[in-house]
């Protein structure tokens, strides 16, 4: 099974979700090493892209080493800045532009972007049309089922987005007001699937092959998008692809290979962000990798401020660990 977006093929149809502060270039490269159909950048605010700040532009870097298509996700409330940001991102090497209409965070919806766009479909469609018209790239859309249980309008917006030129639609099976509580309603995604002919991808609570299979069965979707399930497990998408789509089983790191892998990711973060910011960002990834480690060792790793000391702790924590 393959998802086609114009000339691009997303094979396998197991995609990495955009996650703010997580799916940066170092993490996307780690996922790409094991395999995925697509990796998506963390959300980039369109207005900030126009400022040319290096820290913002870094979020939209698209260079990978495994030949995977890369999508850059843009968020914003107004059509013109979104269109201009899309042009910039295209010039930087993105192969796909994704529009964020699903982020539930108050700091995003309070600015009338993210999932808040679902409350005003006419305005959202003007924004979508502007982005589609600005670039010669496939444009995709990620959204939720609706704002709340009284506004379940994902199918309506999806149909209009397809007419505007959107090539793929990803649905997180919750409303904005649910945030991440309760369970994702994969069956509700089927209504969106029935409303459009472009590929629909299921997202939300997909953490392993079993949940991916249930999501596909219940939604009828063309593929799955994995977010939190990949935290601390960049190989998770490849495992799902092997179980469901006949891809080769990924070779998972174990023993010294595992500590080498975590060390490489840690050093890549420091190289990308610089020492001080990199130390802060690396801690969450180390925390996910170290969930099975002894509590005192894990706590010491979270407190460490010296890279050499942290690398020694990584070797101590992971030298006998096996990926799962």
Swiss-Prot record:
This is Probable tRNA-dihydrouridine synthase. CDD domains: DUS_like_FMN. Keywords: Flavoprotein, FMN, NADP, Oxidoreductase, RNA-binding, tRNA processing, tRNA-binding. The active site is at 103 (proton donor). It catalyses: a 5,6-dihydrouridine in tRNA + NAD(+) = a uridine in tRNA + NADH + H(+); a 5,6-dihydrouridine in tRNA + NADP(+) = a uridine in tRNA + NADPH + H(+). The gene is dus. It comes from Rhodobacter capsulatus (strain ATCC BAA-309 / NBRC 16581 / SB1003). The keyword RNA-binding applies. Catalyzes the synthesis of 5,6-dihydrouridine (D), a modified base found in the D-loop of most tRNAs, via the reduction of the C5-C6 double bond in target uridines.
């Amino acid at each position: 099974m393959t998802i086609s977006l114009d000339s691009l093929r997303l094979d396998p149809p197991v995609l990495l979700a955009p996650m703010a502060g997580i799916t940066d270039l170092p993490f996307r490269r780690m996922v790409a090493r094991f395999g995925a159909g697509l990796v998506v950048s963390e959300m980039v605010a369109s207005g900030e892209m126009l400022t040319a700040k290096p820290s913002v532009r870094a979020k939209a870097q698209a260079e990978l080493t495994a030949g995977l298509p890369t999508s850059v996700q843009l968020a914003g409330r107004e059509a013109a800045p979104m269109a201009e940001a899309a042009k910039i991102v295209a010039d930087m090497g993105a192969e796909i532009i994704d529009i964020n209409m699903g982020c539930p965070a108050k700091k995003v919806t309070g600015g009338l972007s993210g999932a808040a766009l679902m409350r005003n479909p006419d305005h959202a469609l003007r924004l979508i049309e502007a982005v589609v018209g600005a670039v010669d790239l496939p444009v995709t859309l990620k959204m939720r089922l609706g704002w709340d249980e009284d506004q379940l309008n994902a199918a309506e917006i999806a149909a209009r987005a397809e007419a505007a030129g959107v090539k793929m639609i990803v649905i997180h099976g919750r409303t904005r007001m649910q945030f991440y509580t309760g369970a994702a309603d994969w069956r509700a995604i089927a209504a969106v699937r029935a409303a459009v002919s472009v590929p629909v991808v299921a997202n939300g609570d997909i953490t392993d092959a079993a949940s991916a299979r249930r999501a596909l069965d219940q939604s009828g979707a063309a593929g799955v998008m994995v977010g939190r399930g990949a935290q601390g497990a960049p190989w998770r998408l490849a495992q799902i692809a092997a179980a469901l789509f006949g891809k080769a089983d990924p070779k998972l790191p174990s023993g010294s290979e595992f500590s080498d892998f975590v060390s490489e990711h840690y050093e890549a973060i420091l190289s990308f962000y610089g020492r001080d910011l990199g130390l802060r960002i690396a801690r969450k990834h180390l925390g996910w990798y170290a969930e099975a480690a002894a509590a005192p060792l894990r706590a010491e790793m979270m407190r460490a401020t010296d890279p050499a000391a942290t690398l020694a702790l990584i070797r101590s924590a992971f030298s006998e660990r096996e990926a799962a």
